[in-house]
Amino acid sequence: MLHTRTSAAPDTRAREYFEKTIALLNEHGTTPVIVIMPIHPRVLRVMKEHDMGGERQQLRDYLAALEQTASIKVLDFTTIRSFGGEADWFYDGVHITRRNTNRVITAVKAKAGEYLK
């Protein structure tokens, strides 16, 4: 049985440091590329069945809002379809093998290559 829990409140201090880091990078002409890493399809299915994953959606919403005020590029590779990955290429629910890692790197280059210097 899965236990339910409420989402933790965002750490405002961590956000402050994160946003200051992005501002510093932007001041130096750099656009950070932020990659939301994949979750195994089976785990995503269970999360959906049990109405879990709110933190990830909060992260997406936060980064989408931040894109409006800062120069960042966000790539959401939560699903394996988003980067051409394979379900068999996970060590567990969230850790990808070298083969999926290579696919993620290829997708990052294709979708955000102009920011990689």
Language model features with spans:
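Conserved, well-ordered alpha-helix/loop/beta-strand core segments that scaffold catalytic motifs
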Residues: 1-74
